[in-house]
């Protein structure tokens, strides 16, 4: 399973090849998009990218956790976390790719 990790440089290269911008312009475009997404998330806004996913910030209340080594109860402070929820379109594409790969390996 798994494969390679896609980096910013990979995204820049893909924009360069598919859109036809220069590498410098492609890098600037990728950075602008990522900055906009990050700024929105940091400001508590929901980012919904149709057919891809929704990024959302959630508040988690304080709760009691347990130290796994000692069993001692430890308070876990309230915090904000980001959630990623894949769209149904993306989930379906992942499932289809998985089924396609399963079909190749079972022959």
Swiss-Prot record:
Pfam families recorded: Bac_DNA_binding
One Gene Ontology term from the biological process aspect of the record: DNA recombination
Transcription listed as a keyword: yes
Gene3D superfamilies reported in the protein's UniProt record: IHF-like DNA-binding proteins (4.10.520.10)
Species per Swiss-Prot/TrEMBL record: Brucella suis (strain ATCC 23445 / NCTC 10510)
Keyword terms of this UniProt record: DNA recombination, DNA-binding, Transcription, Transcription regulation, Translation regulation
InterPro entries noted in UniProt: Hist_DNA-bd, Histone-like_DNA-bd_CS, IHF-like_DNA-bd_dom_sf, IHF_alpha
GO MF annotations in UniProt: DNA binding; structural constituent of chromatin
Role according to the record: This protein is one of the two subunits of integration host factor, a specific DNA-binding protein that functions in genetic recombination as well as in transcriptional and translational control.
Keyword DNA-binding in annotation: yes
GO cellular component: cytosol
Family the UniProt entry places it in: Belongs to the bacterial histone-like protein family.
Protein name as catalogued: Integration host factor subunit alpha
Gene from which this protein is expressed: ihfA
Assembly information from the UniProt record: Heterodimer of an alpha and a beta chain.
